[in-house]
Every structure is written in C-alpha cells, then in structure tokens.
C-alpha cells in the first residue's frame, strides 16, 4: 500500500490563508500499490462546509467524550475543565476563572448524582477519584488566582485524568450489538493500551473498542500475535501520515493461519447519537456530510485502518498515524473523516511520531492493559 499525491479539487476558501490553501491542495489520498486502484480524494462535497465552534484536538479529551455513558453532571464537570484549553494560551483569566468556578459548583452541588452513575461495587474507587478531583480543583483555583499558567495546565490535566477514570467506572455494558456477519472477526469490547517501540522511540496508543470494536479488535489481535514486530514504516509524508503494517511477501495484509485466507476488516465509523457504527460504506456514500464522529481525525496521532480506496471493507493489517498539524486546520475541517476507520489515538510519544519516516521500524508492540477486553472471533 502506498500514498499518492492528488489535487483535492474545489475547497471552500472561507477564512483560509493562501499558505494553508496551498497546503490543503497538496494533501494525499490513501491507496493500495496496485495499478488502477487509485481514486483521488477530490469530491468537493466533503469539503464544502466547516463545522462551527472549537474542534477538540486533544486525543485524551476525544477519548473521554467517546465513553458510552449517560451522566449529565459528570459531563458538565468535564466540559468546564475542557473549555480551559480554549483560553489558556491567550491567558484569558476571566474566562478561565469562570470555568473553574463552574467546575467547583458542579462537584459541590452534584456529587451525589455523579456518584449515582457508578455501580455500587465501584463506588469506593469513585469516591477516591472524587476526592482527588476536589484536591486538584482547590489547587487549580489557587493557580488561577496567581495567574500561574503552568500550574493551571498541570492541575487541569490531573483533574481531567481523574474525571476520565471516573467516567470509565460508569461504563457497565457494551453499548451495541456487532453485526452477525462480522462475528468471525476479533472484537475489542472496551479499551486497550498498546505500547509500541520504534527505532525512534516509544509510542503509547489507546485503542477504543467502544467506538470501533472490529478495527480495534483486529489491531489488538495482531499486536498480540506480534505481527507488527520488525515491520517497517512504508510511507511517511510530513504533516499528513505515517503508514505501517505491510507484511513481507506478496500479501497486502494478514493471512489467518487457520483459514489461510486474507482477513478483511470493514470500514467502521460511529457517528455520535447513532445506536452503533456504520459499516461498509463511507459517510459520503451514506449521505452524511461532516457529522460529529465519536473518533474524528481532529487529533495529531489518530490511528486508522488503511484500505483500498474503492473497497471500504478491504483493509487488513496496514494502518496509518494521522500527522496533519491541527493548528493549521480550521475547526472541524477534517478531510479524512468518514472515509477511514479511526480506532484510537497516540496519547504519549508525539515527539517520536514526529520523527518517524519511511524506512524506520516497529521494534515491538505489546498490549499493556485491556487485553482481557479482546474477544476472538470464529477464525
């Protein structure tokens, strides 16, 4: 599989600087290295509108919001602290103070309702996390009063990490049924963390089976099989993607040793508000344009399944890391959304990912948590 350069056709120029427009016009389309299988990413329908508001570019925030829970109070608490990221760079202290005040008010008045969202057997752990959040909020309040930017960033991160752990305790059941036609494929019924060691350094990847159980399950299964160990990065484009997972020999993906057949993985995209993922077609083909996705390409280090451009269900072992600089991307302007299955994010190791280029190697990959969430298919 390779990545080729193609023009993107017509783009909305609203609010774009010329330098950004030039960069977008040289974006790349993912295709397999087979003659005649290339289809440019040139449909203007994908590019004709910009989502309003601030796009979330923090992978940890995206993962928190993707948890399948229904507790408005904890979401309100999270929202207040997430919003600080929109103000901290410019040091808008009144807005930051308002966010912290709202967070303190929520945890003071709604603690019981937050705790009620956690199963009884997990509540002792939840109470500990709530205590940690309160401590962080006290320190955060003091840091805001002192206008100490670094301390604000530190205590906000600590509080949000605890909130994410608290929200994870609220998840009880897997949120949807996976279609029977994919029952033979590995499925990740939850989340897993993968530590990938490359010759340039380590990467920590959180893989989200709540939003993309088949794509995530396939990746975790191949990691468990040590399939990726020693494989090279076969293509890398600055400010766009770094791709790996192509096995040696003529095959373009994983051949199941039991069936001796190519393991084909479907396109799998979860739109927020839907009961389950859309399978087997791009969102454009499904008549959906720029919807809000559970796992968007907003974040640097999004990991997605590579596939033939004309075959939504033709992916297998090859994947790519999305490296486009989010600071150059208008809010919600994600050209890849709805065309490829995102199944996780790099949450640590951005510096490593920035250095990876064609010819570098995956030394090893291992699952360090969540392996028990992997359910092997029938083959």
From Swiss-Prot:
Record's keyword terms, sorted: Isomerase, Rotamase, Signal, Thylakoid
PPIase cyclophilin-type domain: residues covered: 190-378
Catalyzed reaction equations: [protein]-peptidylproline (omega=180) = [protein]-peptidylproline (omega=0)
Top enzyme class: isomerase
CDD domains reported in the protein's UniProt record: cyclophilin_TLP40_like (cd01924)
Role, per record: PPIases accelerate the folding of proteins. It catalyzes the cis-trans isomerization of proline imidic peptide bonds in oligopeptides. Required for the assembly and stabilization of PSII.
Organism superkingdom: Bacteria
GO terms of molecular function: peptidyl-prolyl cis-trans isomerase activity
Record keyword Calcium present: no
Lineage, top ranks: Bacteria, Bacillati, Cyanobacteriota, Cyanophyceae, Synechococcales
Listed EC numbers: 5.2.1.8
Subcellular location: Cellular thylakoid lumen
Signal peptide extent: 1-33
Name this polypeptide is given: Putative thylakoid lumen peptidyl-prolyl cis-trans isomerase sll0408
Broad class of the protein's primary localization: other
Coiled-coil spans in chain: none
Cellular component, GO annotation: plasma membrane-derived thylakoid lumen
